[in-house]
């Protein structure tokens, strides 16, 4: 009996997580295949393959995407393990190699790299943080070198057992006078990414969003202007013997946001917010899920800097009428 893993670690689930099975028998037989989550030892699914000598199975429909995946407030610059899940296939006493899955939705190459939709030149406001998702081989050592324009520097080292790690970058790790940060990330001594951050004072009329991008990384951006707040209500009116009254009322509060004028690469990344499965807004120091109600985002396709507008629903609820 041979079980061969055909899919690499961090294969997007929509592409399938494939295993090849060869019983090495001369005649077909029924095979019971167990799909096991390694962290818990739980058998998440069982497949019965009838009259089989060789088969290919896709375990993606039974895989649970890591659910604890949200932007976390960080007051310090640090590495941490990114949420992942590991699975294996068992037939009798024979087990396959394990496969690691995460929330990434784009194909991961074999070489280590930083998974992000935003360009390498970015903006950070005072007391904000950004996070970078790094995908590499299991058991790799990551290094980060952060150099500030004030002359400060910070060097971090991190061993990732799963092959996925997050670098949280906080402006609070540096002097208040910092105006620029240059971040270089290495894996096993080879450079895999560099980023430049312009650090500026934060204005009052701003809103910081985080969202799960098309590639599966959590991106951050502070919208420069929350230029309109809107509260609307929809009433259901009924006629009674005493006259016309409101039977129910549903209220909603939303916020309209405008980005900075940005280059095309940044605008294209921000446009993904409209179709993102998860969008958060920073409120009172914590991250809260919000709904994007913008049906359409328009921007320039010809390279000129432009901006986008978003409408965010903060809450919607039934309002008591007595």
Predicted regions and their residues:
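Preference for solvent-exposed, low-hydrophobicity sequence contexts
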Residues: 1-205
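Extracellular/virion structural assembly segments
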Residues: 2-12, 26-28, 126-138, 169-178, ...
């Amino acid at each position: 009996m041979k079980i061969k893993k055909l899919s690499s670690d961090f294969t997007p689930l929509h592409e399938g997580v494939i295993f090849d099975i060869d019983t090495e028998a001369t005649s077909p037989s029924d095979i019971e295949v167990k799909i096991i989550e390694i962290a818990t030892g739980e058998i998440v699914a069982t497949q019965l393959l009838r009259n089989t000598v060789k088969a290919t199975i896709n375990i993606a429909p039974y895989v649970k995407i890591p659910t604890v995946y949200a932007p976390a407030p960080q007051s310090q610059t640090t590495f941490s393990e990114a949420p992942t899940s590991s699975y294996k296939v068992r037939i009798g006493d024979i087990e396959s190699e394990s496969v690691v899955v995460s929330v990434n939705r784009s194909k991961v190459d074999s070489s280590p790299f930083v998974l992000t939709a935003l360009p390498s030149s970015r903006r950070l406001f005072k007391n904000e943080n950004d996070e970078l998702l790094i995908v590499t081989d299991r058991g790799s050592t990551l290094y980060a070198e952060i150099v500030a324009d004030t002359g400060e520097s910070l060097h971090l080292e991190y061993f990732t057992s799963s092959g996925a790690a997050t670098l949280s970058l906080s402006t609070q790790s540096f002097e208040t006078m910092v105006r620029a940060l240059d971040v270089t990330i290495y894996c096993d001594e080879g450079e895999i990414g560099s980023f430049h951050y312009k650090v500026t004072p934060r204005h009052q009329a701003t809103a910081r969003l985080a969202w799960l991008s098309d590639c599966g990384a959590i991106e951050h951006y502070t919208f420069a202007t929350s230029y309109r707040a809107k509260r609307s209500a929809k009433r259901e009116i009924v006629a009674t013997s005493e006259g016309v009254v409101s039977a129910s009322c549903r209220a909603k509060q939303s916020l309209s946001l405008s980005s900075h004028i940005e280059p095309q690469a940044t605008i294209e990344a921000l446009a993904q917010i409209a179709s993102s499965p998860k969008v958060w807004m920073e409120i009172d120091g914590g991250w809260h899920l919000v709904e994007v109600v913008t049906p359409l985002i328009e921007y320039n396709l010809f390279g000129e800097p432009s901006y986008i507008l978003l409408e965010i629903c903060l809450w919607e609820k039934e309002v008591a009428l007595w």
